Swiss-Prot record:
Mg(2+) binds at residues 99, 101, 114, 133. Pfam families: RecU. This is Holliday junction resolvase RecU. Endonuclease that resolves Holliday junction intermediates in genetic recombination. Cleaves mobile four-strand junctions by introducing symmetrical nicks in paired strands. Promotes annealing of linear ssDNA with homologous dsDNA. Required for DNA repair, homologous recombination and chromosome segregation. Keywords: Cytoplasm, DNA damage, DNA recombination, DNA repair, Endonuclease, Hydrolase, Magnesium, Metal-binding, Nuclease. The keyword Methyltransferase does not apply. It comes from Lactococcus lactis subsp. lactis (strain IL1403) (Streptococcus lactis). One of its GO terms (cellular component) is cytoplasm. InterPro entries: Resolv_RecU, Restrct_endonuc-II-like, tRNA_endonuc-like_dom_sf. GO terms for molecular function: endonuclease activity; magnesium ion binding; nucleic acid binding. Its cofactor is Mg(2+).
Length: 213
């Protein structure tokens, strides 16, 4: 019998546990192997954001560019202090990001971009973009930076780089349309041919943007 400070007690059985037979051990082993296989299979695919992050890590490790994902702002609501030297956040909420997803430096150029994904096949919904992000990209362009968006059509498995200038023009001047036609993206953007390493080689297209700037 073990007595706990809260007054509760727990009795431990002295009856020896029955050993599993060879058959039971075999079944357990097969079941475990199957579960591990299911987990491994589930981790095989990477989402769009993870692929971009892996690409950025590749660029950084090769000394090609320094580009990082901006952390999502958090609104802290409640903090507990179990000890004077330790604080524990017990309640917090994600706040809406004020700018774009990624920023960094490439060949002396400031790089700033947003990454979005859609299940649509023929259009990219503009509701995926917030006006403050459009304003931010406009400000980046005004200061001589390079801004763009990476758009991924999941069901088509197609990824495009669209210069922010094209997005901004479409956002404000196309009569209140709620989406960008894929045909417009293909005409004004650049298709990214995905590789094994790096997965999304977008710097190949950024080179072109640097040349025309």
């Amino acid at each position: 019998m073990v007595n706990y400070p809260n007054g509760r007690s727990r009795a431990y059985s002295t009856v020896p546990k029955k050993k599993k037979s060879l058959t039971e051990l075999s079944v357990t082993k097969k079941s475990t192997s199957k579960t591990k296989g299911m987990v491994a299979f589930g981790k095989r695919g990477m989402n769009f954001e993870a692929e971009i992050n892996a690409t950025n890590e590749y660029y950084l490790s090769r000394g090609l560019a320094v580009i990082h994902k901006k952390p999502t702002p958090i609104q802290i609501v409640k903090v507990d202090y179990p000890q004077r030297s330790r604080a524990k956040i017990t309640e917090a909420y994600f706040r809406q990001a004020s700018t774009t997803d990624y920023s960094g430096v490439y060949k002396g150029h400031y790089i700033d971009f947003e990454a979005k994904e859609t299940q649509q096949k023929t259009v990219f919904p503009l509701k995926n973009f917030h006006e403050h992000q459009i304003v931010h990209m406009s400000n980046v362009l005004a200061q001589g930076g390079i801004a763009f968006v990476l758009l991924h059509f999941a069901r088509l498995n197609e990824t495009y780089l669209l210069p922010s200038s094209c997005l901004i023009t479409f956002y404000y001047e196309k009569g209140g349309l709620k989406s960008i036609p894929l045909s417009h993206i293909r005409e004004n953007g650049y298709k990214i041919e995905t590789n094994h390493i790096p997965r999304i080689p977008y710097l190949e297209i950024v080179n072109k943007l640097c040349e025309v700037q």
